[in-house]
Regions:
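Glycine- and acidic-residue-biased ligand/ion/polar-headgroup-sensing regions
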Residues: 56, 60-66
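A short hydrophobic beta-strand segment most commonly corresponding to one strand
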Residues: 84, 99-114
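Conserved hydrophobic/aromatic beta-strand scaffold that supports enzyme active sites
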Residues: 11, 22, 37-41, 58, ...
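Short beta-strand His + acidic residue motifs that chelate non-heme Fe in jelly-roll/DSBH
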Residues: 48-50, 68-69, 85, 91-98
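Short histidine-centered beta-strand/loop micro-motifs
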Residues: 31-32, 47-53, 94-96, 116
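Short acidic-glycine-tyrosine-enriched beta hairpin
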Residues: 72-87
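Conserved short histidine dyad/triad with adjacent acidic residue
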Residues: 22-25, 38-53
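A short, N-terminal "cap"/entry segment at the start of jelly-roll beta-barrel domains
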Residues: 1-34, 118-120
């Protein structure tokens, strides 16, 4: 069993432009998981860099609203929405709301720096 207290996890700066709290990842979990889950935060007007990752991702929006670009499609997302991002998709997410955009990102297989490529 592993419990992560949100208040005790420090934000790190992501290469793509977001603040990130890494909750579970194979490197910090003892039970041999193959996925990772992290909370991302974007300030008002913030946008991640265009990037692609070899893994599939699921976003679950905790707060705020945004614009999610996946390849050639653009989607509006808001609190309690979820989105599937296929592997190797060109993507970014932008905060278009009036408060922080916070979302969980589940990556399978787990996120690895060498699998994430910034495109801009």
């Amino acid at each position: 069993m592993s419990i992560k207290e949100n208040s005790k996890i420090e934000f790190i700066d992501g290469d793509e432009g977001a603040k990130i709290k890494q909750y579970f990842h194979p490197h910090n979990t003892l039970n041999g998981i193959n996925y990772s889950i992290a909370q991302f935060s974007l300030e008002i007007g913030g946008k991640t860099k265009l990037h692609k990752i070899k893994s599939s991702e699921i976003y679950y929006i905790l707060e705020g609203e945004g614009k999610l670009k996946i390849d050639d499609e653009i989607f509006r997302i808001k609190k309690d929405d979820s989105a599937y991002v296929p592997p190797n998709s060109k993507q970014f997410i932008e905060n278009i709301g009036s408060k922080y955009l916070r979302f969980l990102c589940i990556v399978e297989p787990a996120w690895k720096a060498e699998d994430d490529k910034i495109l801009e």
